[in-house]
A protein has these predicted regions:
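Short, well-ordered beta-strand segments in beta-rich or mixed alpha/beta enzyme
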Residues: 25-33, 62-91, 129
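Glycine-rich beta-strand-turn "strand-cap" elements at beta-sheet edges
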Residues: 4-5, 20-27, 64-71, 100-131
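Short alpha-helical
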Residues: 37, 48, 70-72, 82, ...
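Alpha-helix boundary/capping residues
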Residues: 11, 46-49, 94, 103-106, ...
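An amphipathic, aromatic/His-enriched active-site/gating alpha helix that lines ligand/cofactor pockets
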Residues: 52-62, 80-115
Length: 131
């Protein structure tokens, strides 16, 4: 009986910790439109900042740039941060500042809608940093 209660308590604590973690997670699907004449250079900046962020920042779960098949100037970046604090730290990094300052003149339009994960538990199966 004691072991059963301990197991139940551990499951509740585990669930509570996971719920708290998921409440603080930041998920965005950045929508960026780049001027055609700057597309090649923009993609180089984007690939560099995304790679360095995932490699060097523990709180960056995912930065995954994608290009529209219909319009190559439309970029989408799946951004997942472990917390608001991780996102704020990311904004202060040298590699993000290099990207931000280096691409200001290249970006025609930018939207940063925040998304709400429908199944945050599945993220642990997809993203290694969430395990």
């Amino acid at each position: 009986m004691k072991q059963l209660l301990m197991t139940a308590a551990m499951q509740v604590l585990s669930f509570t910790a996971a719920a708290q973690e998921n409440q603080t997670m930041i998920v965005r699907l950045a929508e960026i439109e780049v001027y055609p004449q700057h597309l090649k250079e923009y993609l180089e900046f984007a690939n560099e900042v995304d790679r360095l962020s995932v490699e060097q920042e523990p709180g960056v779960v995912c930065l995954y740039p994608m290009q529209s098949a219909e319009d190559s100037t439309k970029i989408r970046i799946l951004e997942i941060y472990a917390s608001e604090e991780a996102y704020q730290q990311h904004l202060k990094t040298d590699h993000f500042q290099k990207y931000k300052q280096g691409t200001l003149h290249m970006v025609k339009d930018r939207k940063l809608p925040t998304m709400k994960p429908l199944d945050p538990e599945t993220m642990k199966l997809i993203f290694r940093k969430q395990r």
